[in-house]
Amino acid sequence: MLSKTNQNIFTVSRLNAEVRLLLENEMGIVWLVGEISNFSAPVSGHWYLTLKDSRAQVKCAMFRGNNRRVTFKPANGNQVLVKARLSLYEPRGDYQLIIESMQPEGDGRLQQEFEELKMKLAAEGLFAQTNKLPLPEHPKRVGIITSKTGAALYDILDVLKRRDPSLPVVIYPTMVQGDDAAIQIAQAIGRANSRNECDVLIVGRGGGSLEDLWCFNNEILARTIAASQIPIISAVGHEVDMTIADFVADVRAPTPSAAAELVSRDNSHKDQSLVAKQHKLASAMRYYLSQQKQQSAQLLHRLERQHPSYQLQRQSQQLDELDMRLRRAMQRFIDTRQQAVERKHHRLQLNSPVKHLAQQKSRLERVEHKLLDTMDRKLLTMRHQLAIAAEKLDTVSPLATLKRGYSITQTEQGKVVTSADDVKTGDLLVTRLANGEIHSTVS
């Protein structure tokens, strides 16, 4: 037998609490892709679901404060990518995920890859302002790396022609979209560095979707930009579009036209140096804010685990669980009572007076029909027997004898005369024949 003094004995509640803290503190944030099933959204506003693949599944909860930011309506069968933290639902001891963000799998995978590469390169210092090259105050030749048929090239050339038409330009045509685009752009940067004919490079294209701009989130391209000995201005998409190339480049311009303004002198009144410094400062501020945002997110995550709202979330989940259990119990009770009522109704129908009377009426009709059939058969038999008896009676009937030529003589009083001694002279006699009778007087 184990000695209690030598053992760390847990209660079930304490064990579950310890495991929950271990999962939440040690595992941190995880990214997970899977198919939604058992999705439910009770009145509390929280979401409960199961994420599964072909071999396993895990229960998940997404509380109201987080699911408000989801831009689509989840449904069973959806493939999604979620950002979540591991936890344990203590009352049942169920391991679960607390989802913080959710995206459809396609967009989510790209965004996840973007975030992972961004964190990796930031940790290596590729975004650090100290590693960035300054732009030349008065460029002697500008290199443009973009598609030779894209609108971005013509936007850049239009701005340069308007602001500084004497500025020489070298175009390095390349693909800016598709699977091979990142390698081609990196090769163009390498070619420009080896020729060393330009003192600033503009790398960019027009706006597009996340997939369209994805080549600018390539790690090889990012490292090529960081290694360039010629300052590079990233001018990808619109102002709201941010790529890895924007973070690595020496300066980020919100549009290709803005990049052209950075490298050209406005001969009328614009101070190119001031504009460049403004953009450089803006780039540094964006990098600083990005770093602060990451640190704030980490601090917020720690604070959330200790915040009363976190406890409220867990208690709210317990209330939702109790609510669902109560609803199921009420439904089972209602179903049981309904079945009992149906059974009693069925028994009542079996013993119903109306049904009983109908059965008796049917039985009476059968008896009546049977009685009538019996009477008909009996009457037919009796008629047949009567006919036979009548036939026999006819054979011994006096009328039959009369028909054979015989006659019957009776006195006036109706006495049959069988001997001459039965009459005397003067008696009136009636002789019956087969057809009629004869009246005579004895003489």
UniProtKB/Swiss-Prot annotation:
GO terms for molecular function: exodeoxyribonuclease VII activity; nucleic acid binding. Its EC number is 3.1.11.6. GO terms for cellular component: cytoplasm; exodeoxyribonuclease VII complex. It comes from Vibrio parahaemolyticus serotype O3:K6 (strain RIMD 2210633). Disulfide bonds: none annotated. This is Exodeoxyribonuclease 7 large subunit. Bidirectionally degrades single-stranded DNA into large acid-insoluble oligonucleotides, which are then degraded further into small acid-soluble oligonucleotides. One of its GO terms (biological process) is DNA catabolic process. Heterooligomer composed of large and small subunits. Keywords: Cytoplasm, Exonuclease, Hydrolase, Nuclease.
